[in-house]
Amino acid sequence: MQAMFSRIFFFVLFLTSTIAASFSLKPSRAVTADKREIERGRYLVEEVAKCTECHTPRGAQGQLEHEAWLQGAPIWIMPVRPIANWADRAPALAGLPSLTEQEAERVLAEGIGPEGETLRPPMHIYHMNHEDAHAIVAYLKSLPKAVH
């Protein structure tokens, strides 16, 4: 009787442990959603808005320096005609070092900086919707901050 009780006890213990382990191995929906949002932000930054073209430094051959991804860079393009407020440097975006999430979303949605100023050329005003702006901010926050 005691041997049977021991077997049942260990079987129940094994079953409970197996079930508990299977639940702990599955990522939560929130984590999965966060990963999807970050990936969507990466896609928008790298493939749609092309932020890396100005906000990532270039090497001697003109290639993007991946070790300094989105960490700010001198602007390499110049206007055909002089523009008084043309920016000479694109700020670091990796880790959002100089903007809050709300400020960054406002920049992307309205083209308005943290002090209420309009963005300087060559920065585009994207008029992004909230979901796109939020995804971009999630991606930028996921990157390590610039080390200048």
Where in the sequence are the language-model features?
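The canonical Cys-X-X-Cys-His
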Residues: 41, 48-58, 136, 140
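Electron-transfer interface patches adjacent to heme c in soluble/periplasmic c-type cytochromes
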Residues: 49, 70-106, 124-134
